[in-house]
Amino acid sequence: YTIKRQGDSYNDTDIRSEYASATALRGNLKADNISKYIPVKAGLILSSNTNYIYPDDITEALFTRLLGILFASSYDKNVFIENVMRYPDVNKEIAGRLYKSAMDMITRTVPQGAESKDNGAFSFGSLCEHIKTKEVPLSRIKRALVRITLGLDKKHMEKYANEPYIRVLGFDKKGQEYLSYIRKTVEVPLITKIADYKEMLLDDIHAANIYNMIVAGKYGVKEFGDFVRGPVRV
């Protein structure tokens, strides 16, 4: 049986009770107003890392990607639609709206409904709102745009379904002993050294590089790439 949700509703954007929605927590993160609604340890982790990025921070990466697809499509609407429909969650209607938005971006024309609240320009969030319809929920639009930004089309998704792997992010002394044991029995690659599995992890590395570039541009902080960052030992 299902457990009845307590506190705020799933999509609530405001915090009204001691059990806030994830949507509200993310929305209030900027204002540093969530410490009393999350576990103490989680609060300590958040307070020790202030290099946050938000959906609108990937706007430039998204539109650079869309511009690349336009170029590859010779700016032809039908070819563009065919190309972006290769990505999961993108149907013909979404693809058509994306084409118009991408062309408007080139001519610096912001379609009604896609203005940013900050400066009237395009943003990831405002574009999602512009593209969504009654039949296509906002969550689907966001997934589609992130996949386009990362270049993860349907072929990539099929590859991950058929080629699973385990990437170890961290372990303690006991975990190290366990890893030594399961390495002999596990049927999929158990990855602790990224350089040994470069081809398999290219998409992970690409996504991490986009993140690192955004952080560097926003905060002037250079993040270490996945090739030089090993599992965390605790």
Name each model feature, range by range.
Residues 1-234:
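Active-site cores that bind ATP or allylic diphosphates and position pyrophosphate for catalysis
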